[in-house]
Amino acid sequence: MKVTVVGAGNVGATCADVIAHKELCNEVILVDIKENFAEGKALDIWQTAPVNMYDTRIKGSTNDYSKTANSDVVVITSVLPRKPGMSRDDLISTNAMIVKTVTENVIKHSPKAIIIVVSNPLDVMTYCAYLTAKI
């Protein structure tokens, strides 16, 4: 089984770490738009494998969705975070575009994947992914 986590920030990296540590799949792909960010996080997680006694493969990628091909599950965590004083609605249009782009890439490379959205505002981002995936 292959799981992709899109977004290597705190939520995404923690999600990838837990999935790998609990051996919920054979391979975790961590993707982020920031250059070398996902690769670094994946390497950090992978290097804990011997100590934590798991053998899940984990790899990072900078925006190369071809590495996510044939994922069984994709977790979308990538959006811009809220800054102090912002409401959850302030970033809807920006975050919707991010989720739309990510979902299009997911469908292109893993059309049968189960998509889990963990991006705020959650209800709107989930609906955006649903519409984009044309489920």
Language model features: what each stretch is:
Residues 8-9:
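Glycine-rich Rossmann-fold phosphate-binding loop(s) that bind the pyrophosphate
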Residues 87-134:
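Rossmann-like NAD(P)(H) cofactor-binding subdomain of soluble oxidoreductases
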Residues 72-75:
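N-terminal Rossmann-like NAD(P) cofactor-binding module of classical short-chain dehydrogenase/reductase
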Residues 25-29:
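Short beta-strand element of Class I
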Residues 33-70:
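Conserved N-terminal Rossmann-fold NAD(P) cofactor-binding segment
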Residues 78-80:
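Conserved NAD(P)H cofactor-binding loop of Rossmann-fold oxidoreductase domains
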Residues 12-13:
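N-terminal Rossmann-fold NAD(P) dinucleotide-binding loop
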